[in-house]
């Protein structure tokens, strides 16, 4: 009985050790950190309030809090995020999220990140449906995401200010 107890104790300790090591290996997949502030060319300022929450101050006193959710569409460094309005501060929305969600390819940059729009959660969003089909059919997901970013003219580039 004592040998069995020692064996179970050793196996439990090994399992816990492996879990701790693996949990420590996983880094954040987003190219920003909490409390960082970024600015785009339209003078929108994004403050990262949590890994999945942004506060955006735009022109003409527009300000809102957004929820930023990861999706299953990921490559090595590029990923797709769904952005929704959590709270409009002054009754306005600087990112103009019309439907429940707007989908963007989040790409790391040297001094920040970029957001490339790829559709909305509206049921008739042809752009989002085409993206989903193309992604599912792509063998190299990262290469597909890079091509999508290169093919879209409208891209918001945010540079770190602090």
From Swiss-Prot:
One of its GO terms (cellular component) is plasma membrane. A lipid is attached at residue 25 (S-diacylglycerol cysteine). It comes from the Bacteria. Residues 1-24 form the signal peptide. Keywords: Cell membrane, Lipoprotein, Membrane, Palmitate, Plasmid, Signal. This is Uncharacterized protein pXO2-32/BXB0031/GBAA_pXO2_0031. It comes from Bacillus anthracis. It is found in: Cell membrane. The keyword Methyltransferase does not apply. InterPro entries: DUF5512 (IPR020257). It is a lipid-anchor. It holds the Pfam family DUF5512. A lipid is attached at residue 25 (N-palmitoyl cysteine).
């Amino acid at each position: 009985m004592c040998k069995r107890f020692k064996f179970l104790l050793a196996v439990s300790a090994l399992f816990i050790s492996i879990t701790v090591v693996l949990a420590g290996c996983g880094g954040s997949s987003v190219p920003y950190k909490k409390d960082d502030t970024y600015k785009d060319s339209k003078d929108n300022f994004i403050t990262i309030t949590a890994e999945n929450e942004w506060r955006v101050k735009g022109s003409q006193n527009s300000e809102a809090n957004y929820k930023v959710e990861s999706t299953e569409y990921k490559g090595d460094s590029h990923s797709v995020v769904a952005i929704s309005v959590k709270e409009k501060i002054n009754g306005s929305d600087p990112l103009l999220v019309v439907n429940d969600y707007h989908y963007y390819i989040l790409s790391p940059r040297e001094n920040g990140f970029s957001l490339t729009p790829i559709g909305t959660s509206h049921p008739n969003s042809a752009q989002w449906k085409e993206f989903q089909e193309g992604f599912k059919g792509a063998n190299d997901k990262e290469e597909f995401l890079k091509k999508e970013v290169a093919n879209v003219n409208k891209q918001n580039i945010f540079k770190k200010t602090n």
